[in-house]
């Protein structure tokens, strides 16, 4: 039962990687993230199949490259919650939705804010 779920998980990861590799519009960082999810999923699978397996960092490091540190720290795409909203640039604009005030920016999406 456990082996079947692990195999299913790996096939999903491979299909996801194939989709990432097929679309040329993704940047290189996106492709490296796909590789990192596959290698991260393959290590526990090998450890279950062969308990004496020890992952080789030499195998993982060329695949991950400089994005190895990005596995732990991923930027979130959420909104900042503030009590006093301000326009941070000329492109920012205010919107009132659901009784709250929001700031959106098409030029710099990191300027998104929500009144809290």
From Swiss-Prot:
Q: Mind naming one GO cellular-component term on file for this protein?
A: mitochondrial large ribosomal subunit
What are the recorded Gene Ontology BP terms?
Answer: translation
Report the transmembrane regions from the record.
Answer: none
Say if the entry is tagged with keyword Magnesium.
Answer: no
Q: Which UniProt keywords apply?
A: Mitochondrion, Ribonucleoprotein, Ribosomal protein, Transit peptide
The UniProt GO MF terms for this protein read:
structural constituent of ribosome
InterPro entries tied to this protein? Mitoribosomal_bL36m (IPR052143), Ribosomal_bL36 (IPR000473), Ribosomal_bL36_sp (IPR035977)
Which Pfam families would you find in this protein's record? Ribosomal_L36
Enumerate the subcellular locations listed in this protein's record, separating them with semicolons.
Answer: Mitochondrion
Decide whether keyword Membrane is in the record: no
Q: Which SUPFAM superfamilies match?
A: Ribosomal protein L36 (SSF57840)
What family does the database annotate? Answer: Belongs to the bacterial ribosomal protein bL36 family.
Q: How does it assemble?
A: Component of the mitochondrial ribosome large subunit (39S) which comprises a 16S rRNA and about 50 distinct proteins.
Q: What is this protein called?
A: Large ribosomal subunit protein bL36m
